[in-house]
Regions:
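Classic N-terminal secretory signal peptides
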Residues: 2-19
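Mature soluble domains of exported/periplasmic/lumenal proteins and thiol-rich metal-chelating peptides
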Residues: 21-103
Length: 103
């Protein structure tokens, strides 16, 4: 009986890790990271410049920098506040959707 209970608990823990989560933050780049935690025109210009130079988009939320798997979904969103839905594992997000946050 204990083995069944332990197995059921393990299944619940792993299942909860794969559910989609919603995170709001600012799109930055891997080079600058949390330097662009606040949305601005200057941040947008810098992020897009760094990405065009080979850096990748990241999401900064509550001081944490998340790596993003779907880079093409973030084109034109550098330096802007967004809401990302996806699966979070450590500091990486498997992105299901992204939308620019208004106000």
């Amino acid at each position: 009986m204990k083995k069944i209970a332990l197995l059921a608990f393990a299944v619940l823990v792993f299942a909860s890790m794969s559910f989609a989560k919603t995170i709001t933050g600012t799109v930055s780049d891997a080079h600058c990271g949390a330097k662009h935690a606040t949305p601005s025109d200057a941040a947008a210009h810098c992020v897009e410049h760094c990405v065009s130079g080979g850096s990748t988009y990241v999401l900064v939320s509550n001081g944490k920098v998340y790596q993003l798997d779907s880079q093409d979904k973030f084109k034109g969103l550098g330096g802007k506040s967004v809401t990302v839905k996806g699966s979070v594992k450590g500091d990486s997000i498997t992105v299901a959707s992204v939308a620019e946050k208004t106000s």
